[in-house]
């Protein structure tokens, strides 16, 4: 556990379900293994994979593997990480929550990671109004708190009724996802309106001089040792 210093993170664009694995190395073979174990064997083959332009995702071997599975590879750049904003947002949450737990855990971030992922998967997401868990599996998860302090859902458990309820939930999962898509579209429109309201128009014509900002790949200083390499 102590030699794990990298974290490979995957987020589904729609359901917001997140998978993450601590790694000692982050080579193309490690990325390939992660794609197979954490994505393909659990959720099926993705249509598009958006990643940074690290060598582990842009090697001949990884491209060949993606081609065999008919996965389209797209890449964000270090100067514009917002191109993969979904994962960037999740990374901030994971790093923030890990930092909160590190003092009590004496720096054992690998052991704390499952707790952080569990919290993220079982909390409603602002953009969809649903939890990533329910968007993925069609039903809400029973959290440990419900077993210690019985709720109506756990105290009135009946195997037959439970099977029927699960079947109904699966029948309604497409409707739930359609409603979430409407909510997501509305949320994105509101974000766009807020962003556009603060944009100052600067009309340019051919021949105008412009200042080009060269952005380095420096870490966020608040992330300390938890930042990307």
Indicate where each model-derived feature is located:
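Integrase module of LTR retroelements
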Residues: 1-176, 183-184, 189-229
